[in-house]
Every structure is written in C-alpha cells, then in structure tokens.
C-alpha cells in the first residue's frame, strides 16, 4: 500500500481504502502481484516479477484467470536490504 501511495496511485494514508473491493485484483482497476508475489513464486528475487509483467503484456502466456485484459503498461518494483534500496522498471506493450 505504501508503494501504491509513493507511486501516486492514491494519496498518502489512503492506500488501505484504495485496495478495498478488488481494485488491485486481476479483474480490477489496477491489478497488482498477478503471480502472487514473494509468497507464491518470486524465488529468483525479482526476476520472476519481470517475466510475469512481460507475459501479461504479451497477453497470451499466463493462465486465463490471471491474465489482465488489454494490459498496456507494467511496473515491477522491489526493495533490497532493510528497505534501504528500491528499484523500479516500467514496461510497455508493443
């Protein structure tokens, strides 16, 4: 939620309300962690986040229930250390 606030998708302190009611689920306004994040599939520390974003942008390489319809832009972000480093990658569909 803090990252969504920091990226400007919602105002500071409004992250909790922003994610309610499925807004960040696969069929929502802003799908987040469509592959489950670090709890499910990110064992290569971030690389699987990149491959997931590319697959989503290609539009035909993930299971139908996880596919974001008409995905045009993907943001991959990650933290390192004790939240002392951060990296972001913005990808776009061709």
Give residue spans per PLM region.
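Claisen-condensing/thiolase-fold acyl-transfer catalytic domains that form or cleave C-C bonds
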Residues: 1-94
């Amino acid at each position: 939620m803090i990252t969504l606030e920091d990226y400007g998708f919602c105002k500071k302190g409004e992250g909790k309300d922003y994610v309610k009611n499925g807004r960040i689920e696969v069929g929502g306004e802003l799908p987040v962690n469509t592959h489950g994040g670090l709890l499910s599939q990110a064992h290569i520390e971030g690389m699987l986040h990149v491959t997931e974003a590319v697959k989503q942008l290609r539009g035909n390489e993930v299971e139908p229930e996880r596919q974001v319809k008409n995905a045009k832009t993907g943001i991959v972000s990650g933290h390192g250390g004790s939240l002392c480093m951060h990296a972001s990658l913005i990808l776009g569909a061709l």
